[in-house]
Amino acid sequence: MELSSRKPYFIEEEEEENLASSLSEMEAGFSGNNNNSNNHGNPQNGVVSSSRFSYGRLNSLRNSQSYYYNQYSVSSPRSVVSGRFHDFRFDIQQPHFLDSCFLCKKPLGDNRDIYMYRGDTPFCSEECRQEQIERDEAKEKKQNLSHSVKSAMRRKEQSSPTRSRDYAFHNGTVAAA
């Protein structure tokens, strides 16, 4: 099996008509230098009147398209994902979440207890678990405090939108000359 020598090639079957039309345009452009007025529009020669592309050639391209689709989507070491290649060699393998303690990163296992927190966070001891609980509570308090301060400031600004405390106004008569 010579997987390394093959180049990735994939054509979706849905794009068969688009492929045939673009190939016919390419063929017409390629053979555009050979203007044979004898063959143009002659149905006996298998030439389409609007382009220089034969129906027989079009069918052979359709057949070769399914050949490439079937050959490379099955035998390629890569998986076809929504019409694109996905190369599994570059996937980073994440360790299983129960392999190590979330806080101190000590390996778990060897018939030792695993202490869980919030359903999917493993710890090697009750102390590590408790420390994480305290960290999360402190973070939540800080977020709640900042949220309550912000909402209090908004309420304060909304209650007196027309009042301006920063500017000094002088009440009195102004005379202009």
UniProtKB/Swiss-Prot annotation:
Pfam families: zf-FLZ. One of its GO terms (molecular function) is kinase binding. It is found in: Nucleus; Cytoplasm. Keywords: Cytoplasm, Metal-binding, Nucleus, Zinc, Zinc-finger. Residues 134-143, 154-168 have a biased composition (Basic and acidic residues). InterPro entries: FLZ1/2/3, Zf-FLZ_dom. GO terms for biological process: cellular response to hypoxia; response to glucose; response to mannose; response to starvation; response to sucrose. Induction: Down-regulated in response to mild as well as prolonged energy depletion. Up-regulated by glucose, sucrose and mannose. Residues 22-49, 134-177 are annotated as: Disordered. Residues 22-46 have a biased composition (Low complexity). GO terms for cellular component: cytoplasm; nucleus. A zinc finger (FLZ-type) spans 96-140. May act as an adapter to facilitate the interaction of SnRK1 complex with effector proteins, conferring tissue- and stimulus-type specific differences in the SnRK1 regulation pathway. Belongs to the FLZ family. Interacts with KIN10 and KIN11 via its FLZ-type zinc finger domain. Interacts with KINB1, KINB2 and KINB3 via its N-terminal part. Interacts with DSP3 and BBX21 via its FLZ-type zinc finger domain. Forms heterodimer with FLZ7 and FLZ15 in vitro. This is FCS-Like Zinc finger 1. The gene is FLZ1.
